[in-house]
Amino acid sequence: MEENSSELDSNNFNVLVDNLAGLSLTDEEVRRILSPRKEGSRQLPSSTSKDEDSEEASHKYDFEIDRDSLKSDSGSPRLHQNATAPTSSTPLQSPDESVNKLNSEDEEGNSSVAPFFLDTTNFDRLNDNITTDDEQLSPVLTANQGFQSQEQYEEDSYNNYDYTSDPSSPNYISSSLDQLPHLDDEDDLQLTPIKEERNYLHSQDAPTTNALSKKISDILIPASAMKDLKDRKNALAKEFEESQPGSSLTLKEQANVIDNLRKEVFGLKLKCYFLYDQLNKFHDQEVQDIMKQNIDLKTLTMELQRAVAGYEKKISGLESRIKPDQSFNLSTPSPAPSNLITLQSRYSQALSELETTKRAFAALRKEKSKKTNYSVGAYNEDRNVLSNMLDNERREKEALLQELESLRVQLSKKVPMPAKNTDERVIETLQRSNELLRMDISMQNEALLLRKQENDRLVKQVEELTVALNSGKMNAIVEAESSKNELWDSMMVSRMKTQEQSIELTRLYKQLQDIEEDYENKLMRMEQQWREDVDQLQEYVEEITQELQDTKEVLSKSSKESDDYEEVVGKLRTEAEREIEKFEKTIRENEESISLFKEEVEKLTDEITQLSERYNDKCHEFDELQKRLQTLEEENNKAKEDSTSKTSNLLEQLKMTEAEVDSLRKENEENKQVIALKESELVKSNDNKLLLNEQIESLNDQLSQLKTEMESVTTSKESLADYLSNLKERHNDELDSLNKKLREFEGILSSNSSLKSEIEERNNQYVTLRENFDSLQNAIMETFDKQVTHCSVNHLVQQIRKLKDENKKDQSGTDKLMKKIYHCEQSLKEKTNSLETLVSEKKELKNLLDAERRSKKAIQLELENLSSQAFRRNLSGSSSPSERSQSRELKLLQASEKRLKEQVEERNSLIKNIVTRFTQLNTGSKPVNTNVEALTTISSMNQAVNMNFRELDKSIQEFKRKCQSMEREFKTELRKLDGVLEARSKRLSQLEERVKLLGAGSTSSIPNSPRASKRVSLDSEDKKLVPASPDKSAVQRGITALKRDAEGMSHIWQLRLREMEFQLKAEQEGRKRDKLGARERLQDLIRQNRSLSRQIKTDKESNSRSPSISSQEHK
């Protein structure tokens, strides 16, 4: 028993020394402690088993130390080193092992969890540097410094936590229970029992910083409190030096005292560590609660900021209203000077109140920025938890102090020892550690007191801010009441304006529908015409290709015949020369046969006469072909004259369009000015209308809605400005394009003049060619004449080459002319399209201007009436209007509200219809959002209008793109057709040339010899008379087909011109009808304005009578 008791005493002594070594810690040591705690939860099972083995070895080593060795070596410092060597090297246990041990113990014993104690192994790492200085930092203070250096994490709050179900509880609970000494019941100096605290254990994924650590880090301890703490520490040190405890105690008594002191120190360590864990560890639900509180605080701050911004915007709006109000007062009859003075005083008061609200909100912002991001409710909960913990600590502290005082009394009664042993040093270190712990507790108490004071101060500041907010609200309400009386009259004006605007919108919508229908009908007609023209052209091209193939075959045959004829003529000439030579020889030889030869010559002369007759027949055929060619040339000249007449008509039309463009420019400039004025008036009327509607409902609603309305007004103004700038840019671009087109038209006119000169030159060239052709005919006649002795073939070949070269030049010139004419036609078509668009835009702008002028006149009349009413009210003095007048005004307001609602609904329906119409036109575009909400506010109305206008612009642009693509395709197809026609014209010219050559090569062949002349003539007649008939028939067919084609094309163009004339006449009639309808609408609006003016006069008379009646009743 004695050996076991000695072993227990030695073990407790070693534990006490180890715990004392952990009291004085530096910042680096605390960080070393925290890092293995985090790393311990991630260790593998192999590492944890090694830690357990090392811990068991250290415990065995501690129990082997005897009590006698303690007595003998009490003064040597090696005892402490040997005792702490094995324990200091043991690492911390992982939380997973501790959880497994606790779960196994709970399942076996079904016992409740023991009080929360520390394991000695968790503090063995701190035994390397044992210091006795009093100024070392305590664990709590060093932990607080560690919190300040760590990163921020999510906010958490305290909540009850069941440590029995937590799987992350540390392993040092069970080990510390096993290693605690067994206390005797008879011992007088027992420590107060440690209460079972709730175990806020730290999970593996728990944060290292939290809300409480942030709050504690923000606390600043004053210098005076630190001085007091140092003074107390010095006083306690002096008392311990003077007392000299343990001089007359035995070893057993000293051991008991040491054990008691060790227990006290261990309990204080546990409490400090427990508080440290409570600061670090929270439950997940508490984290969520703190996050919600933080979000609520942020929303409150955002609402306050928005309120401040709204008040600032309201101030700026009221300041901006000063100028238009002044301009309005200048236009109206000037009121009495007393009213002006009262208005100025009210305005100055409102400005002063607004400045006070600004200052109050600025102060609120500054104070709010200094505050933390935590709500008052969460802060009070944390404060209550900390106060409860501190109360418990104070009670325990008082019990400990009483026990310490009793120990001091007992120690003072006994005789002091002559020399200080190791036990005395241990006692001194324990006493100093107790002092440090007490100082830490006092510091925490003082920090909590300071925190409470700060809470009280913050609560007071919040109350002051609420009072300031209430005062600001009251000032705003007073301002709203003052502005309500001023804006009451403008509400009627805005309502009348909205009525007129709705009427104008209906009229514009009808006009848009008519314009859309006209454009659709025109497009359908153009498409049908285009398709018919394409079909006709395709058929015509096919016929031409077939005829050209036939003519090619005929020409190939004719060319072959002409070559054969030339060869036969050459052979005949050579044979004739040879025969003449032979004949001369024979004459010389045989004079007797001369008579016979004469007979033969006569026969030859007869044959030659026959050949000349045939030649004459061929000449007649050639003349007929020339006549046909002349008829074709006359037809071509007629076509040229028609084209020139068409170009002259187009020039006249262009001049007319130029005059219309100039007038449109002037009207567009006037329209821009009027539109700008109307848009400014509409914005003002909408602002007044919305403000009045909101003020009638409730003043509190005004304060909440003014913010959003002012923002929407600014955005709407910006969007309208952008829209106007875009319109101006588009208009400028259109004007530039028109100028360019006019310049191009001037160039076209100059090109037409040059074309005319070129045509004249070509006619001259044609005359020269005709003369050359006649000369060629004469040369051919001379070659076949009897009187000519030699042939002129070379001369013929040269002339033919010249004719071919000149023909090629003429063809190139005609091609160039056709291209120029084509470009001119394209430019004319583009100009006609642009002019049509300008005419349509001109109509729309005229209608808008007429409507805006009418609305302006009505608004001016209403303003005059309202100004006269206000002037009469001011003259009547401060007397309030009668109940009848008030009831009438209320009825009028209700009726006007109903009208406004109806107008808004009509406007929304009109916008929907317009959008649907544009979507029908743009089949490929995306559908437009037609779900337009009730536009009862400026923001919603402006947003809806802007969105619809943007979508309309997009749809219009897409429609324009489609039209442009259609025009491009149409132009490409026309170019292709023009190319085909040009090729056809070239082929026709070539055919004409070949037909001309056919006349020269259609003569019959000459026989080979004079003796066989009859046979050759008969054979030639049989062979060549047969194919002559199909050649003539083919040529005649080609000429008749050409005539028919020319007549068909001229007929198509005539039909087109007639249709264009009909369209122009229909457009003129439509314009006349539009003018008549506009005049009728103007007359209707004038009648309505007159009726409204009469009603206003009657209302004025009734209002003027009602105050007189009320004054009589008062009298």
UniProtKB/Swiss-Prot annotation:
Residues 25-180, 1001-1037, 1067-1115 are annotated as: Disordered. Residues 72-102, 119-130, 139-151, 1001-1011, 1086-1095, 1104-1115 have a biased composition (Polar residues). Residues 165-176 have a biased composition (Low complexity). Residues 28-41, 56-71, 1016-1025, 1067-1084 have a biased composition (Basic and acidic residues). InterPro entries: Cnn_1N, Mto1-like_Mto2p-bd. Spindle pole body (SPB) component that acts as the gamma-tubulin complex-binding protein of the SPB outer plaque. Promotes nucleation of all cytoplasmic microtubules by recruiting the gamma-tubulin complex to the spindle pole body (SPB), to the interphase microtubule organizing center (iMTOC), and to the equatorial MTOC (eMTOC) during anaphase. Residues 445-915, 1072-1102 form a coiled coil. GO terms for cellular component: equatorial microtubule organizing center; half bridge of mitotic spindle pole body; interphase microtubule organizing center; microtubule; microtubule cytoskeleton; microtubule organizing center; mitotic actomyosin contractile ring, proximal layer; mitotic spindle pole body. The gene is mto1. The keyword Phosphoprotein applies. It comes from Schizosaccharomyces pombe (strain 972 / ATCC 24843). Disruption phenotype: Abolishes cytoplasmic microtubule (MT) nucleation from SPB and non-SPB sites. Leads to MTs escaping from the nucleus to form fewer and thicker cytoplasmic MT bundles that curve around the cell tip. Curved cell shape. Leads to unclustering of centromeres at the nuclear periphery; normally, the centromeres cluster at the SPB during interphase. It is found in: Cytoplasm, Cytoskeleton, Microtubule organizing center, Spindle pole body; Cytoplasm, Cytoskeleton, Microtubule organizing center. Interacts with mto2; the interaction is direct and required for efficient binding to the gamma-tubulin complex. Interacts with gamma tubulin complex subunits alp4, alp6 and gtb1. Interacts with mcp6. GO terms for molecular function: calmodulin binding. Keywords: Coiled coil, Cytoplasm, Cytoskeleton, Microtubule, Phosphoprotein. The modification Phosphoserine is found at S94, S1005, S1009. GO terms for biological process: astral microtubule nucleation; centromere clustering at the mitotic interphase nuclear envelope; dynein-driven meiotic oscillatory nuclear movement; establishment of mitotic spindle orientation; karyogamy involved in conjugation with cellular fusion; microtubule nucleation by interphase microtubule organizing center; nuclear migration by microtubule mediated pushing forces; spindle pole body-led chromosome movement during mitotic interphase. Residues 523-537 are annotated as: Required for interaction with mto2. This is Gamma tubulin complex adapter mto1.
